[in-house]
Swiss-Prot record:
Membrane topology field: Multi-pass membrane protein
Gene3D superfamilies: F1F0 ATP synthase subunit C (1.20.20.10)
Annotated localization: Plastid, Chloroplast thylakoid membrane
Protein name: ATP synthase subunit c, chloroplastic
Site (Reversibly protonated during proton transport): 61
PANTHER family found in the cross-reference section: ATP SYNTHASE LIPID-BINDING PROTEIN, MITOCHONDRIAL, ATPASE PROTEIN 9
Membrane-spanning intervals of the chain: 7-27, 57-77
One annotated GO molecular function: proton-transporting ATP synthase activity, rotational mechanism
Presence of the UniProt keyword Thylakoid in the record: yes
Length: 81
């Protein structure tokens, strides 16, 4: 196994997880903040807002999991070796 390919795979795996978590992290923070503001404005709509928030957080978290899957593929099932 070429050490250059191994090193590049490890760096790419780290970058894929890191970059894949930036967008969803910012989005989750914004969504949670807006949900808290919405609940503060209309406390009677708490259940509906919370359900929508949890569903949207799950979709955002899926993007980070895709980055993790790419990283694991680069580390353990490397197609370049």
């Amino acid at each position: 196994m070429n050490p250059l390919i191994s090193a590049a795979s490890v760096i790419a795996a780290g970058l894929s997880v890191g970059l894949a978590s930036i967008g969803p992290g910012i989005g989750q923070g914004t969504a949670a903040g807006q949900a808290v503001e919405g609940i503060a404005r209309q406390p009677e709509a708490e259940g509906k807002i919370r359900g929508t928030l949890l569903l949207s957080l799950a979709f955002m978290e899926a993007l980070t999991i895709y980055g993790l899957v790419v990283a694991l593929a680069l580390l353990f099932a490397n197609p370049f070796v």
